[in-house]
A protein has these predicted regions:
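N-terminal signal-anchor transmembrane segment
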Residues: 1-45, 58-77
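Membrane-interface alpha helices of multi-pass inner-membrane proteins
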Residues: 9-14, 186-201, 368-374
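Aromatic-anchored transmembrane helix interface
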Residues: 29-35, 55-68, 80-107, 120-123, ...
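Alpha-helical transmembrane segments of multi-pass inner-membrane proteins
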Residues: 98-109, 113-143, 154-221, 242
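Transmembrane alpha-helices of multi-pass inner-membrane enzymes
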Residues: 166, 343, 362-374, 378-411
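A membrane-periplasm/extracellular boundary helix in multi-pass inner-membrane enzymes
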Residues: 220-263, 278-285
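Hydrophobic transmembrane alpha-helices and their immediate junctions
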Residues: 226-228, 331-367
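Long extracytoplasmic/lumenal interhelical loops at the membrane interface
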Residues: 267-271, 275, 289-332
């Protein structure tokens, strides 16, 4: 169990700079989990365990259901001209299903995870973040303004980084009991991922990251003196101002896009996103498993050319609609949209299932995915799906009743 736990943490943290091996390690963790479920697990009291963890189990089932919606669609509608969409959804769906299976085993065996493993995982996560900074710096040094590392685009890289930052914060919160050391690790993590996200210049991810940090500060500082609140807000404001200055070109571009949209010119980046949201609703498939990607594209293209004449939107809709719910509804039909809504609902419920005690990491994770999913599609890229699924596994373990010996080890 401890080996699987460490493998998953390493998989998440190394995904952007080590090619192929993180996915292989993920599969190894999955196979070990399946082996544990079939041959090694003690099933005594299983029914009682299910009842006491029903919300967490519902969240795991929603992950499996979400993966199944992607996998089934890719098998029913094998596109001839948009093969990469089919391949990504096939691989991503499979990885999400395996994440749910692995999480089930680790959740059942969470009491076996030692305090030393939690500390090692936290340190590993921070070190891998620093290594990502190094590889990102090397990429910028050769003249690439918006780094993408091993992902398919800078935006994908940024979304993975936000998920990695949530995992890093959560592991630090779990493993470091000394308030001073924890604060130092928090600050280091904040600087690491602020710099990484700045190198991607992805506005949505940077905004989401600062919201995540603010919510985390609210939980961590709720019982401290007001002057510490002031210092924390001052630090975030200063760094945020520095990032805003560094990204002023992208901010001016966004402002210009909004001005153009007010003049009914939707042929801009932001304008095209509003057009895609409208088109996605009009071409949504009310069938159970959705429609072919080419069929959706042709319907959406005709609608946009008739109502908006936005060349930017027509170019983008070939692959996705820049919104997770609209994307699922328009492509994977009723099954897809129900699956992703259940994922969000059960995820938020699982983060606050205990009275007066939140799973802060899971809450931040779900909030980040929801916010980023409003302006882009997260599950279309297989590596993103793997990181999201694997991160859910770890975060779900961070606040379980079975972890009493972790608390004892701190005392």
């Amino acid at each position: 169990v401890n080996i699987i736990f460490i493998l998953i943490v390493f998989t998440i943290g190394s995904d952007l700079f080590i090619e192929a091996y993180p996915r292989k390690l993920f599969y190894i963790g999955c196979y070990l989990s399946i082996f544990g479920l079939l041959f090694l697990e003690n099933w005594k009291g299983f029914r009682q365990w299910l009842l006491s963890n029903k919300i967490a189990i519902a969240f795991l089932l929603s992950i499996v259901l979400l993966g199944a919606s992607k996998l089934i669609w890719s098998m029913i509608f094998p596109s001839t001209h948009l093969q990469d969409i089919k391949d990504n959804y096939y691989a991503g769906g499979k990885l999400l299903i395996l994440s749910g299976v692995m999480a089930f085993y680790l959740l059942k065996s969470v009491s076996v995870i030692s305090f030393q493993s939690w500390k090692f995982a936290a340190c590993t996560s921070v070190v891998l973040g620093l290594l990502t900074v190094w590889f990102g710096y090397q990429e910028q040094a050769i003249g690439i303004n918006r780094i993408k590392l091993l992902a398919d685009a800078a935006t994908t890289t940024a979304y993975i980084m936000v998920v990695q930052s949530v995992l890093c914060f959560s592991l630090i919160k779990k493993a470091v009991s000394n308030q001073l050391y924890r604060t130092v690790f928090y600050i280091a993590t904040f600087f690491i991922f602020s710099y990484l996200l700045l190198m991607t210049e992805t506005r949505g991810a940077i905004g989401t990251f600062f919201i995540v940090c603010f919510v985390l500060a609210c939980f961590e500082l709720r019982n401290v003196k007001p002057r510490y609140w002031f210092l924390a807000l001052l630090a975030i404001s200063v760094i945020g101002g520095g990032i805003a200055y560094k990204m002023q070109k992208r901010i001016v571009e966004a402002y210009d896009n909004i001005q153009q949209l007010q003049k009914n010119n939707a042929n801009t980046s932001l304008g095209a996103r509003f057009v895609m949201l409208d088109a996605g609703q009009h071409v949504a498939s009310f069938s159970l498993f959705g429609q072919d990607a080419e069929q959706r594209y042709n319907k959406a293209r005709q609608y946009i050319e008739k109502n908006y004449k936005s060349a930017e939107a027509v170019r983008a809709i070939k692959y996705h609609f820049h919104n997770d719910i609209i994307e699922s509804f328009s492509l994977q039909g009723l099954f897809g949209v129900i699956a992703i809504i259940l994922f969000y609902v059960t995820g938020f419920l699982a983060s606050c299932e205990k009275k007066n005690k939140f799973n802060v990491g899971l809450l931040l994770y779900m909030s980040a995915l929801f916010l980023m999913g409003l302006t882009d599609v997260l599950f279309i890229q297989r590596n993103t799906a793997m990181v999201i699924g694997a991160c859910a596994v770890i975060l779900l373990l961070c606040q379980r009743d079975e972890n009493k010996k972790i608390e004892n080890a701190r005392q």
